[in-house]
């Protein structure tokens, strides 16, 4: 049966009373969806993008959304193989493959902290099995907790939420032949981005970072005033900034500037001869004798952590009515007391996994989590009960926050919510008697489960909205999402262990910023030492003020928390996005150029991140081609700027073709 080439006019508009949305694939007909082709390609996409996203996320703390590149590839391969009626299959490929970003975001923000703390506490054990099980169970829980909210977010709120990522992905899938032609451009961009980052990571052809210390006056400025400028010139980060856009990258950069160019120099000036170590006895230097990086590490980051945590709390408060309404709706359908539930079950495009199966599946998943905590993590019945209760309550409450954030801005504040989980879990576990190294591992595993659940919930609502617009069967998307979660959890566990063995998370090229923050928060709490509550409070106050001023507090707080050199390239990418989409007087031309730029940037991200994994494999195998003497030469940073300029020129040039 032929499918219309364009979405209906009411696809992005609020429906009038009695009006129904008619998707592209008619609810009255059946179409190919779950086939060996779609499942195989979905698994392949999950493996590839899990590896790429894990590398990039551990490097900079930002996980790129794989939905759009996967959709482009799905359309491209189906067009190249001349498959008919492939739209439903492409949605399944995208849905299975998109598990990559969700599982990666959940795992890498928390679980590397186990490795980080292991360096300080050798008795801590980290294994592939623990990482895999925590990621898998968190992903499964996120899917099960999100399904009861599908009808509310996807159908009832149709036209009220913009769903930016789902919109872009749907347009790619619907475009068909256009998407197939785009595949070549995506692959070319991936090749450019991949080679660019590969020659830096593997051969050190030029310096990865450019700093103001490369010149004499910059060194003097950094030593005397603690003001320093740094930027990473990688292709993947530049592409990420382009896709995020100028508004949010500017806010992130403002947060970074506030810490690095105001708070850090200000603390050095005010507390120049003071040792501030009330919460950390290992700090023995005066603030004035520290470098800018050390002041940021010991003080600035904690302000960012407080801001992220408060932004998460504000998100829960704002979403409370959504939680309540969705619970009422789900409970009515679970009891079978709703005529609309029976009607929806009969309509293919409104058919979910049975709520009874969801309830039983949720209980079984929580039981498995309890057994995992009891026998694999805590080795204590009471602690395991406390742990599973905390996981269940927090994951369920924050599910709507994650879905709501994705529906509105396409960004999931999962790191802030996980920080809250860790702080709460640490306080509760210490109160019931579980502390020290074993308490740290327990809290981090709990955080890993919750973080993956929330990340999966946010990502999955995007998939379901795509399916709603196109007309696929939600039940099939939901069922096969579990397979994607399994594959992604296994992949990210392996990549994480590889990268830790090659680089290490505590320092160096894989900073794992979120995981380092988790380790910094949990260590003092679990050892009975103080915590920088005053700094957390300052960050929380900043978040409240920003929210009151209607400025996205989470983006600003992330900027305060993530190192400067990883934030500045984001705003460079965002500025290029603005330039590309505003140069023409013709709005349609600007829109087309913006779409081309998104495609090229996606290629830079995917290629750069994938080749980063290849470079890590070479290092792990013992191949080291880096000449450190060359990287210490200022000319390596000069060459880095030239290469960076060429990369920017390439993207701008491609958008005008």
Residue ranges, per PLM feature:
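Alpha-helical multipass membrane-protein architecture
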Residues: 1-657
């Amino acid at each position: 049966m032929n499918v219309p080439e364009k979405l209906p006019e009411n696809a992005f508009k609020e429906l009038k009373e009695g009006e129904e949305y008619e998707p592209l694939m008619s609810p009255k007909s059946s179409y190919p969806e779950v086939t060996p082709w779609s499942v195989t390609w979905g698994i392949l996409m999950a493996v590839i993008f899990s590896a790429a996203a894990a590398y990039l996320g551990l490097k900079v703390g930002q996980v790129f959304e794989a939905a759009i590149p996967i959709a482009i590839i799905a359309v491209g391969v189906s067009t190249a193989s001349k498959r008919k009626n492939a739209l439903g299959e492409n949605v399944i490929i995208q849905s299975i493959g998109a598990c990559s970003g969700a599982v990666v975001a959940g795992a890498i923000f928390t679980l590397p902290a186990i490795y980080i703390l292991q360096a300080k506490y050798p008795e801590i054990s980290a294994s592939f099995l623990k990482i895999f099980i925590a990621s898998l169970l968190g992903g499964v829980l996120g899917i099960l907790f999100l399904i009861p909210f599908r009808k509310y977010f996807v159908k009832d709120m149709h036209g009220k939420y913009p769903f930016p990522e789902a919109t872009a992905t749907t347009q790619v899938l619907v475009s068909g032949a256009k998407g197939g032609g785009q595949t070549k451009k995506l692959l070319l961009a991936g090749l450019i981005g991949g080679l660019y980052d590969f020659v830096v990571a593997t051969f050190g052809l030029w310096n990865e970072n450019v700093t103001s210390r490369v010149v004499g006056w910059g060194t003097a400025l950094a030593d005397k005033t603690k003001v320093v400028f740094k930027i990473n010139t990688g292709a993947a980060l530049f592409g990420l900034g382009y896709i995020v856009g100028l508004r949010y990258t500017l806010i992130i950069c403002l947060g970074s500037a506030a810490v690095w160019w105001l708070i850090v120099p200000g603390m050095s000036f005010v507390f120049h001869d003071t040792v501030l170590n009330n919460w950390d006895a290992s700090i023995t230097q005066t603030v004035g004798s520290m470098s800018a990086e050390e002041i940021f590490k010991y003080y600035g980051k904690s302000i960012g952590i407080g801001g992220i945590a408060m932004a998460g709390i504000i998100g829960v408060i704002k979403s409370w009515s959504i939680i309540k309404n969705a619970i009422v709706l789900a409970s009515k359908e679970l009891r079978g007391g709703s005529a609309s539930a029976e009607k929806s079950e009969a309509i293919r495009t409104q058919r979910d996994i049975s709520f009874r199966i969801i309830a039983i599946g949720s209980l079984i998943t929580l039981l498995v989590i309890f057994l995992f905590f009891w026998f694999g993590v805590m080795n204590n019945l009471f602690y395991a009960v406390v742990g599973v209760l905390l996981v269940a309550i927090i994951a369920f409450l924050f599910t709507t926050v994650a879905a709501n954030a994705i529906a509105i801005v396409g960004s999931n504040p999962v790191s802030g919510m996980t920080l809250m989980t860790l702080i709460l879990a640490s306080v509760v576990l210490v109160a019931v008697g579980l502390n020290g190294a074993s308490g740290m591992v327990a809290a981090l595993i709990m955080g890993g489960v919750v973080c993956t659940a929330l990340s999966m919930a946010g990502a999955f609502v995007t998939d379901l909205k795509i399916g709603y617009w196109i007309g696929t069967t939600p039940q099939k998307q939901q069922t096969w999402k579990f397979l994607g979660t399994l594959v992604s959890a296994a992949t990210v566990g392996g990549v994480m262990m590889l990268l830790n063995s090659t680089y290490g998370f505590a320092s160096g090229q894989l900073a794992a910023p979120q995981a380092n923050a988790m380790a910094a928060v949990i260590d003092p709490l679990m050892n009975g030492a103080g915590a920088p509550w005053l700094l957390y409070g300052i960050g929380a106050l900043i978040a409240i003020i920003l929210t009151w001023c209607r400025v996205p507090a989470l983006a600003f707080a992330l900027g305060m928390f993530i190192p400067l050199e990883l934030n500045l390239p984001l705003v460079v990418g965002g500025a290029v996005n603005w330039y590309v989409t505003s140069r023409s007087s013709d709005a349609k031309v600007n829109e087309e150029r913006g779409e081309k730029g998104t495609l090229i940037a996606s290629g830079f991200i995917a290629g750069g991140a994938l080749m980063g994994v290849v470079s890590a494999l070479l290092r792990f195998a013992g191949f080291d081609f880096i000449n450190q003497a060359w990287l210490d030469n200022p000319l390596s940073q000069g060459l880095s700027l030239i290469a960076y300029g060429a990369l920017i020129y390439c993207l701008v040039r491609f958008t005008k073709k």
